[in-house]
Amino acid sequence: MRKIIHIDMDCFFAAVEMRDNPALRDIPIAIGGSRERRGAISTANYPARQFGVRSAMPTAMALKLCPHLTLLPGRFDAYKEASRHVRDIFSRYTSLIEPLSLDEAWLDVTDSPHCYGSATLIAREIRQTIFNELQLTASAGVAPVKFLAKIASDLNKPNGQYVITPADVPGFLKTLPLAKIPGVGKVSAAKLENMGLRTCGDIQQCDLAMLLKRFGKFGRVLWERSQGIDERDVNSERLRKSVGVERTLAEDIHEWSDCEAIIEHLYPELERRLAIVKPDLLIARQGVKLKFNDFQQTTQEHVWPQLNKEDLITTARKTWDERRGERGVRLVGLHVTLLDPQLERQLVLGL
C-alpha cells in the first residue's frame, strides 16, 4: 500500500506578501486584478475570505464584497523563490515529487526511511521545517492514493493535516460528497444530484455501464474514485505542458455575446498564470475549449508563438459556429500549450 502526501501551502502568494510586509497581516489583501481593469483574484488572505473574497473571483465582485480590500499586483519572482525552497525541503524526504503548481505537490514517501517510515510524521516534520525556514504555513493530506491525499489536505486548513489510513478509506468514501472529487464542478454535482447521486456511497450502488452511457469517460472516473481506485503514480518527471483557465457556468449559455464576455474575463487570469512559467518556456499553441450541456466537449488550437486575445476570440467564434449546433455551453476555457524544453533547445541550437 502506498503512502502519498499532498502538501498545499496556505494562501501562498498572500502569505509571502504578509511575511515580507507584516503591516499587511491583519488587513484584507488579495493578489491579482486591479481597480482600473477587469481581472480575477489569484489568492486572498483569511481576513479577506471572511468577507467572501475567493480565488478566481472577478476583481469587481471582490471589491463589492470588501470595498477596503488591498489589491497587490503580485511578485512572481518572490513566489518562485519560496516555491523552490519548499521543493528543496521536499527533496530531503523523497525523490518522488510531483508539483501541481507553485504552491502544491504530491510526494510518494512509501519507501522513505525518515521518521520511522511514518507518512504522518513526515508530513508533520515537512510542515514544521517549512515554517522554521520560510515562516510560511502549509497544510497536508496523507492517504494511500493521490486524489484522497489531495482531498485530505483541504480538511484541516490552515496549518493542519488530515490522515486517511487504508482502513479509513471505505467509511470516508461512503459519505464523501461527489463535489469533493477533483474534476467534479458545481454543474456536474448538480446534475448528479438530480439523479439522486450525492455521495461516493451512492455511486458505489450504480452500474458502471449506466455511468459510462450517461457520462462517457467521466463516468468511469466517478466509479473508480468512489471505490477508492486511483492508480496514478506520483510522477517526478512531470513537466508543465500547458497553462489554462476555465469556468464552469451556473447556467448554460446559448448566445455568442455571453461566451465572448466570459473570454474577456478569463483572459487576464490566463496572462497571470502564464507569467509564472513563461520566462522558462516558449508557447507552441493557444486554444479554446467549449463543453456542452450533453457533456461532450471540443478543443480548437492554433499554432501561435505568443498569447493573443484577438486570435483566441476568433478561434472561439469559429468553434462556436461550427461545433455547437443547438446545444447549450456549460464551460468555457482558454489555454496555451508550451514548447517541450528539449525541442526548444534543439530549435535554439539550430538557429
Curated annotation (Swiss-Prot):
Designated name of the protein: DNA polymerase IV
Main location group: cytoplasm
Listed GO MF terms: damaged DNA binding; DNA-directed DNA polymerase activity; magnesium ion binding
Record-level GO cellular component terms: cytosol
Intracellular or extracellular location(s): Cytoplasm
Keywords: Cytoplasm, DNA damage, DNA repair, DNA replication, DNA-binding, DNA-directed DNA polymerase, Magnesium, Metal-binding, Mutator protein, Nucleotidyltransferase, Transferase
Taxonomic source organism: Salmonella paratyphi A (strain ATCC 9150 / SARB42)
Quaternary organization: Monomer.
Gene3D superfamilies assigned: 3.30.70.270, 3.40.1170.60, 5' to 3' exonuclease, C-terminal subdomain (1.10.150.20), DNA polymerase, Y-family, little finger domain (3.30.1490.100)
Substrate discrimination (site feature) positions: F13
Cofactor: binding details: Binds 2 magnesium ions per subunit.
Cofactor: Mg(2+)
Enzyme class, UniProt record, top EC level: transferase
Annotated CDD domains: PolY_Pol_IV_kappa
Active site: E104
Domain UmuC: start-end pairs: 4-185
